[in-house]
Swiss-Prot record:
InterPro entries: PurM-like_C_dom (IPR010918), PurM-like_C_sf (IPR036676), PurM-like_N (IPR016188), PurM-like_N_sf (IPR036921), PurM_cligase (IPR004733). Its EC number is 6.3.3.1. One of its GO terms (molecular function) is phosphoribosylformylglycinamidine cyclo-ligase activity. It catalyses: 2-formamido-N(1)-(5-O-phospho-beta-D-ribosyl)acetamidine + ATP = 5-amino-1-(5-phospho-beta-D-ribosyl)imidazole + ADP + phosphate + H(+). It holds the Pfam family AIRS. SUPFAM superfamilies: PurM C-terminal domain-like, PurM N-terminal domain-like. GO terms for biological process: 'de novo' IMP biosynthetic process; adenine biosynthetic process. This is Phosphoribosylformylglycinamidine cyclo-ligase.
Length: 340
């Protein structure tokens, strides 16, 4: 028995792994940007930081996955956008620190290497990288029979960006009186899906619920996470933003306080939050307390900015999209987030 056959009998298909690499090359090529060194397939991805033109560079890194949203992608056999979710979760975190994404690496683990399916996953990663302006410079595809079922896979990503040292956003500039501006989310994004799956456990995904404006449930649930990089970078370059909060797991309650000091609080006007229909559906069909929704989901605001009042108009001008004035920064009395 050859070594190859022995490995195949243990459940690992080396040839399928080679096929995946060949299939994804064209998708990786879409993400090329200045600074990338070397070709796909090396032991390590290389990037020339001098190509960024940043005078005092500070590297900012982030890693994340997409949680159990993956289980819906597997259930509905829609694998082409879940990679964008993975990129978004990472790059939106580092843009919140004032960093421009430079490069990205992905990690896919599966029970059985299916080249066509994994190509779809990586194509989604590449699309996310294009939207973020980041190069996909490396990754790993691990076939792990016995660890995962044949149809199962997990996905994680790693983003590295650069910030000008003087433009780092760390919460120190947020002050009482700052205006809170909300940027719209595209949907649920990539958190809260353990609850979402419970709420819709008995649904096929093909339903068109009255709350969802004619869309099938599965399409709304798998709507890819918005990537905010290209919208927000110009604001950072002009130093118009004092704080940024990426609204992920924990919703408003956990994420908004991460962008300011402990002696401050956020006062949110609920009537000004552009709540998306899917959140009304989740609340209704899941019989969830209204206030708890803000502790779990983004509620229609995926990124929140703290901006000095005199800069609000310029920020709106640069964003060129609907911007929601949903609150302000106040002195903390009790809670870090007050929803009125």
């Amino acid at each position: 028995m050859s070594e190859k056959n022995a490995y195949a009998k243990s459940g690992v298909d080396v040839e399928a792994g080679y096929e995946v690499v060949e299939r994804i090359k064209k998708h990786v090529a879409r993400t090329e940007r200045a600074g990338v060194m070397g070709a796909l397939g090396g032991f390590g991805g290389m990037f020339d930081l001098s190509k960024t033109g940043v005078r005092e560079p500070v590297l900012v890194s982030g890693t994340d996955g997409v949680g159990t949203k993956l289980m819906l992608a597997i259930k509905y056999q829609q694998h082409d956008t879940i990679g964008q979710d993975c990129v978004a979760m990472c790059v939106n975190d580092i843009i919140a620190a004032g960093a421009e994404p430079l490069y990205f690496l992905d990690y896919v683990a599966t029970g059985k290497n299916e080249p066509a399916k994994l190509e779809q996953v990586v194509a989604g990663v590449a699309e996310g990288c294009v939207q973020a302006g980041a190069a996909l410079i490396g990754g790993e595809t691990a076939e792990m029979p016995g660890m995962y079922g044949e149809d199962d896979y997990d996905l994680a990503g790693f983003a590295v960006g650069v910030a000008e040292k003087s433009q780092i956003i760390d919460g120190s500039k947020v002050k009482e009186g700052d205006i809170l501006l909300g940027l719209a989310s595209s949907g649920i994004h990539s958190n809260g899906y353990s609850l979402v799956r419970r709420v819709f456990a008995d649904y096929t995904g093909n339903e068109v619920l009255p709350e969802l404006e004619g869309k099938q449930l599965k399409d709304v649930l798998l709507e890819p996470t918005r990537i905010y990089v290209k919208a927000v970078l110009p604001l950072i370059k002009e130093e118009l933003v004092n704080g940024i909060a990426h609204i992920t797991g924990g919703g408003f309650i956990e994420n908004v306080p991460r962008m300011f000091a402990d002696d401050l609080a956020a006062e949110i006007d609920e009537d000004k939050v552009p709540v998306l229909p899917i959140f009304n559906a989740i609340e209704k069909y899941g019989d969830i307390k209204h206030e708890e929704m803000f502790e779990i989901f983004n509620m229609g605001v995926g990124l929140m900015l703290a901006v000095s009042p005199e800069n609000v108009n310029r920020v709106k001008e640069l964003l060129d999209e609907p911007v929601y004035e949903i609150g302000r920064i106040i002195k903390k009395a009790d809670d870090s987030v007050v929803i009125k």
